[in-house]
């Protein structure tokens, strides 16, 4: 037996170690794992080196028995300890004395653990095909070698050194420098003992030698402004998709969306502070259910530093904002909506990100997530940076985020913001301010491919989840697989045209008649949503009510008539919060809506609210208003050219042959004996009239039932004669009759000349 085997041998730094040690304390060493921890030294013995700048003494102990294997030597007064281990020394831990005379603390050596990164993950990230990179990158609770802690991983290919800094190490970048993975730009480290809600950042020694303290791009939690640290949180459990998701997002389903900014929908009256997710799960969900909306669309909920961005400039894309509560409470809000039969859409910002120092901006000293050239990478209108959609790791980051919100929180779809700014290189740029694509065109080919692929991934991985595009140009095939592959596109053209028409004085509307009909010229080119969104009630544009001309009565009547026209027109519906009760002032994100208006004398606002509630319930209960939105068989103009009277009449149909005739009179003149042709004989029932007194209208109506007469009109053998209320929209419903009833009606009216196609359809 070698009697000298367990005799302590002093650690003698080699000549070249001084430079290494200095770089460790300067936090400039690119790979501390190559030096710290357990390593063989020149005489083929093993040594343990530990960097603890605040420690007084460290013993190397048997991690199983706690027995001291070897006391260490302090080989640098700044706090570097080393011990040469005896042969066949067991696995070790540390017994650290921080102050002389105090009790020692058992700790793990962070540099004794291997990497948790898998080669497959790194390969998929580099290829741009890692569907769920958030399961690998970021901060994740883990157990390694029986020790609990958190594994951290980040992508920073051009960094010289990356460290995890946080509460657990005094924000000291020397303590937890990460392991570099040459070739893929990844860095990782496992830190034992880090707990839930610990604050952290990445300290990045960038490509230019500058220190940048960055929030974790993949963090599941983040501090509320003004502080900017990431928060260690567990990966949310997968959410169960509601059984009705696929049906609710179908192009043949009734979709009526209530767009909500959670911070200003309603506030606590005592302190004007935000409602919590828990309060909203009760108050918002019950309100939306009562009002008859089918979907809630939430403005962006990724953590953002500037309240005035409304969430559209996020720095923590994977971190639900803590303004309103915890991630679990957000999931409970979505669950409450699902329990009420309501789908929830998340406003998702994938086009740009803010320039905040702690965010993605020049993350490792280079344009990592953005383009280096400002002609490609800088958005002049919003002072934000544009994602580099041609970079695989960036595509992974964004596509994974879309999946994350749907799979982990239960959102039923995403609405992608500012798509036009993504797909055009010259968006809001003058000549000379943009770079053409490889073919010389203005399209951003990489962004187009990214959107198409992201939507394909959603369709494959989250069946039934919807994707909605806010796209403001005439870019073709937004909702076609060969195009951008969205499910729906916001019809910004319809919104702009019809609002311009409605802002005209009724006496002038006859000169702008085509603005209300033009939408049908391209209706079947895309699957459309008709949006009256937050963008239309801010920045001096006035509220929807404020846009309406005339005195008080006329303003409210105009708005009710317009809503009726909108709900009858083909396309899914969207109203921003406050529009449903005609809020008079513009939206202010710093205050709750003016709910007190519902209690005002006169009942104007309450009348609009009651009207929208009835509109929603009528819309969802009658298939002619939604089933064939995207098929020509579901729509027919009956009167499209009566510009002198500013009257529009059209028919909506479903597959069963049920009909709803929509009549809108956009003048304050009562039109008596107004006649128009109809396709089917028989009785029609008035199911909606925006001029009813319960809505604060004038009460002009036609009775419950109206019968078609044997009077030709507008090229039809049958016609109706009505009194049209002023500034009003009326819906007439006719249920499809059995063929025998149709034949009887035809004989009674002596009208055999009904088209064979119609007769067969019935």
Swiss-Prot record:
Keyword terms: Carbohydrate metabolism, Glycogen biosynthesis, Glycogen metabolism, Glycosyltransferase, Transferase
SMART domains linked: Aamy
Keyword Glycosyltransferase appears in the UniProt entry: yes
Cellular component terms (Gene Ontology): cytosol
Coiled coil: none
PANTHER family: 1,4-ALPHA-GLUCAN-BRANCHING ENZYME
Function, in words: Catalyzes the formation of the alpha-1,6-glucosidic linkages in glycogen by scission of a 1,4-alpha-linked oligosaccharide from growing alpha-1,4-glucan chains and the subsequent attachment of the oligosaccharide to the alpha-1,6 position.
Name used for this protein in its record: 1,4-alpha-glucan branching enzyme GlgB
Lineage, highest ranks first: Bacteria, Pseudomonadati, Pseudomonadota, Betaproteobacteria, Neisseriales
